Amino acid sequence: MELDRAVGVLGAATLLLSFLGMAWALQAADTCPEVKMVGLEGSDKLTILRGCPGLPGAPGPKGEAGTNGKRGERGPPGPPGKAGPPGPNGAPGEPQPCLTGPRTCKDLLDRGHFLSGWHTIYLPDCRPLTVLCDMDTDGGGWTVFQRRVDGSVDFYRDWATYKQGFGSRLGEFWLGNDNIHALTAQGTSELRVDLVDFEDNYQFAKYRSFKVADEAEKYNLVLGAFVEGSAGDSLTFHNNQSFSTKDQDNDLNTGNCAVMFQGAWWYKNCHVSNLNGRYLRGTHGSFANGINWKSGKGYNYSYKVSEMKVRPA
């Protein structure tokens, strides 16, 4: 009897504790996890109350670095920084060759170059130009701009070719109207014409001054007085005349003198000299279309050698 009563009291106490635990769990639901019941059934069930989270533990060891990500796009440049202090002065520069180099073959001669041949000079625009220098004739220092010696080069050319120049350093050439203009625009230049016939007789003609205008003025010839020469004067007639070629007729004739006499020259109406005519090797039956100098050997004789050259006066 007493035993049954004790069992009943114990069961009631257990049930009361269960209700109190559930009530406390509900009250703490906002801060702690839910109550969890485990077991099978009846009085065998166990009530587990999960406590509130404890204090954070100590940090764990640092993990290994991950792999590098892809490189991002380059951003816009930032604003320029402030200028730094001036740097030290550089070493003195070398003078440009065109400022100190020779301008003519006469300059070369004055600097001790006594051998005739091809040399480099510098035009007023600092452009280098390789020219044939005659250091032997009449005191030397002559710049040769026209040479005929063997007929190896055709001189019956168009305007553009005469403008640029043509021929060979080994033989015949025309230096080019642009180059002749640049050479004679530097100051007063005297002109010498040397002629040799097929019997090796020499003739020459000298003029006090010689200048060729630029292309805009059709390479107009500006010639000074005839000074001397065994060949006589066959160029004054052409003074103040424009240059003409087979494709650009600037003469005073109704026809084209360059075509009629197969050359290129400062034709008037038409010529008394034609040093850029055909290489006809001495006496020829055709009229005035050879390397002719009328006051020398007339219209029907073509010279073996012709050279035109300038030197500062």
UniProtKB/Swiss-Prot annotation:
Give the family, as the similarity comment puts it: Belongs to the ficolin lectin family.
Summary of subunit composition and partner proteins = Homotrimer. Interacts with elastin. Interacts with MASP1 and MASP2. Interacts with CR1.
Q: In which tissues is it expressed?
A: Expressed by the liver and secreted in plasma.
One GO molecular function term? proteoglycan binding
Tell me the leader sequence span.
Answer: 1-25
Q: Where is the Fibrinogen C-terminal domain?
A: 96-313
Q: Where is this region: Disordered?
A: 51-99
Glycan-modified residues: N240, N300
The molecule here is called Ficolin-2
Residues forming the Collagen-like domain are: 51-92
Residue numbers bearing the Hydroxyproline modification? P77, P80, P86
Question: Which SUPFAM superfamilies does this one have?
Answer: Fibrinogen C-terminal domain-like
Q: What NCBIfam families does UniProt report for this protein, alphabetically?
A: GGGWT_bact
Where composition is biased (Pro residues), the residues are 76-89
